[in-house]
Amino acid sequence: MVPDLHGSIRDWWDADAHHYDRSVGHAISDPVEAAAWRAALRRFLPAPPSRVLDVGAGTGSLSLLAAELGHEVTALDLSEGMLDRARRKAEERGSAISFVVGAAEAPPDGPFDAVIERHVAWTLPDPVAAFSAWRAVAPTGRVVLFEGSWGGEGPLVKVKDGIVALIHRIRGNADDHHGPYPEVVVRHLPLAATTTPAPFVDAVRAAGWRAVQLERLLDVEWAAEQREPWPLGPLTRRPRYAIVAEA
């Protein structure tokens, strides 16, 4: 029996909303890391002001940076709880962002000049369908996926993860993230355990996007590593990349 994937995913993120920004690697609050992400947006987005749809916007990290750069941003997320946090941040900063509650596969009509996402594609039950829907609302635009290699069950990965967890416990580091998706949900997420960007690139191409380019985000990786005290930075570093394509 196939679970209610959207309902399960929505409930999971609603439950995580109040803790999300306190979890390691989620919020873009460090100035050096924010500068790296700002530079990435400048590289890959059309010149401002452009109409940008941020899919899976969460608590608004990327939406806020894009708005700061002068773009007209629409933030889409399945979780009302996550968007509530994003709205509060936007109000505090005076950022004019439109917020829409909904699934990635059913974006608002647009049209948009660019569709962006950060660490969201792995949560999609049908990535090709979602990417196709994004192309429909950005018929002359581009898509920018900011992703990473989060999967991996090899012995080295397990050892690193164990050491990181031990260091956090010893140091008493706060991380209220309430754990991984239920296994019954993960089994239905095609990109949940990818260890290379190839499956993301293949899904983008299968959705009809063209001129697909892949770029390693070494500046973002370095900034994220510097954010963490030694030795957590090197231990938690993962390859990150941008996948950019045209409609």
Spans of features found by a protein language model:
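Class I SAM-dependent methyltransferase SAM/SAH-binding core
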Residues: 53, 59-106
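A short acidic, Gly/Pro-enriched loop at the edge of an enzyme's catalytic core
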Residues: 105-115
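A short SAM/SAH-binding and catalytic strip from SAM-dependent methyltransferases
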Residues: 114-127
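Conserved class I S-adenosyl-L-methionine
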Residues: 1-47, 144-174, 218-220, 235
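Core SAM-dependent methyltransferase catalytic element
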Residues: 226-247
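A short glycine-rich, Lys/Arg-flanked "PGG" loop and its adjoining helix->strand segment in the class I
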Residues: 128-142
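Short alpha-helix
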Residues: 190-208, 214
